[in-house]
Amino acid sequence: MLNNKILSCGLTGNFGFFHTKISILYGTNIVSGLNYKKKGSLYLNLPIFSSSYKSVKITKCKISIIFIPSYFCKNIIIENIYSGIKIIVCISEDITLYDMLKIKFFCNKYNILFIGPNSPGIIIPFYKIRLGIFPIKNIIIGNLFIFSRSGTLTYKAIKLSRKNKLGQSLCLGIGGDIIIGLNIKKFFSYFINFNLTKNILIIGEIGSTIENQFLKYKKKKIFFFISGIFSPLKTTMGHSGAINNKFNDILKKIKKIKKYFLILNNLNEINLIK
């Protein structure tokens, strides 16, 4: 992943253009854009292709970043997969459940690493890789891997990690929609031996079981922060994936995690991570 070229799907739109420009200035190796209506044109001095296949064939890109409206995501993502893209980072939110089930099916079938949807993306400061919408003001090279379901809390953790001179080795927003595409085992097959990472901060919340996949992990030092402890049952909080219910009660989750790891009472306790 660290040396691969990147296709920006949605580069020609205002949102995609803005964040692609920031990523390029940061140092990310984005080489092309995708828009069949604007094929042959240049945006940010990057060629715009009519299809993922042509972009992969000509530029040899293996990663795509998705900035397009959710209605079009399924077809573009499946086209990415068939064209040879191996890693897909989806910023778009509110992809329908049916479309996400199809996307997950194809990602599993073709062994694709999919991050999102409704994700701020991923940033790796040491390698100047920014795939998504992370603000770079507080990004500094360090040894803390921040893994979060909430984009806003990720940004706060980044700011506090800089303030406490921890820095970041890698920051990942897994996505806030009800169905996310991330395969934890596949993601860690890429990054689990990432030498720059000393500690991992997992920011969990209501409505998710993904934290449970870390309970028996011992290769790195892990710290947790779980938000939403006072949230009412059966009420969506913030985004569609954040809902507390009797099948995944947050207090039971915290009790289970406490058996294995330290849970921060609030993110200001990030200074406890050493």
Question: What would you call each of these model-derived segments?
Answer:
Residues M1-K274:
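Catalytic-core regions of core metabolic enzymes
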